[in-house]
């Protein structure tokens, strides 16, 4: 029987394989969610570089949020990431939800990033 971590890795690799098929050179917006925080970064897979990143642990957000584990925090991270991406000149990305379902905090971050100007 596969462990929880094995199933998460398998699911994430399945999602990433689908993303590589449709990326067409666009950077990838990768999201990670833990029980206390949420992290997002825009990665250029061709160059192997991180273009922009944001999380609830950033000094811009850390003390202004009640907790890093709710949809309000995810929305703030999405807006901050979109702002940093626009400064870096990125508008079109591919959304990589990893092994997480598109619901709750993941959905809130994605919608806030779209409102901030990212296209995916």
Swiss-Prot record:
SUPFAM superfamilies named in the record: Translational machinery components
Gene Ontology MF, one: structural constituent of ribosome
Gene3D superfamilies per record: 3.30.420.100
Keyword terms, alphabetized: Ribonucleoprotein, Ribosomal protein, RNA-binding, rRNA-binding
Disulfide links within the chain: none
CDD domains to which the protein is assigned, alphabetical: Ribosomal_L18_L5e
Biological processes, Gene Ontology terms: translation
Single GO cellular component term: cytosolic large ribosomal subunit
InterPro entries cross-referenced by the UniProt entry: Ribosomal_uL18_bac-type, Ribosomal_uL18_bac/euk
Domain of life from the UniProt record: Bacteria
Pfam families: Ribosomal_L18p
Keyword Secreted: no
Family in the record: Belongs to the universal ribosomal protein uL18 family.
PANTHER family hit by this protein: 39S RIBOSOMAL PROTEIN L18, MITOCHONDRIAL, LARGE RIBOSOMAL SUBUNIT PROTEIN UL18M
Oligomeric form and interacting partners: Part of the 50S ribosomal subunit; part of the 5S rRNA/L5/L18/L25 subcomplex. Contacts the 5S and 23S rRNAs.
Function: This is one of the proteins that bind and probably mediate the attachment of the 5S RNA into the large ribosomal subunit, where it forms part of the central protuberance.
Protein name: Large ribosomal subunit protein uL18
Species per Swiss-Prot/TrEMBL record: Sinorhizobium medicae (strain WSM419) (Ensifer medicae)
Lineage: Bacteria, Pseudomonadati, Pseudomonadota, Alphaproteobacteria, Hyphomicrobiales
């Amino acid at each position: 029987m596969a462990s929880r971590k094995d199933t998460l890795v398998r699911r994430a690799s399945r999602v990433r394989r689908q993303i590589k098929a449709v990326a067409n050179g666009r950077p990838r917006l990768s999201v990670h969610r833990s029980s206390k925080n949420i992290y997002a970064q825009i990665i250029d897979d061709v160059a192997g570089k991180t273009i922009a990143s944001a999380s609830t642990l950033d000094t811009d957000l850390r003390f202004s949020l009640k907790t890093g584990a709710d949809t309000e925090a995810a929305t703030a991270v999405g807006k901050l990431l979109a702002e940093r991406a626009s400064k870096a000149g990125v508008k079109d990305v591919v959304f990589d939800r990893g092994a997480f379902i598109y619901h709750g905090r993941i959905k809130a971050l994605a919608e806030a990033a779209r409102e901030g100007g990212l296209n995916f």
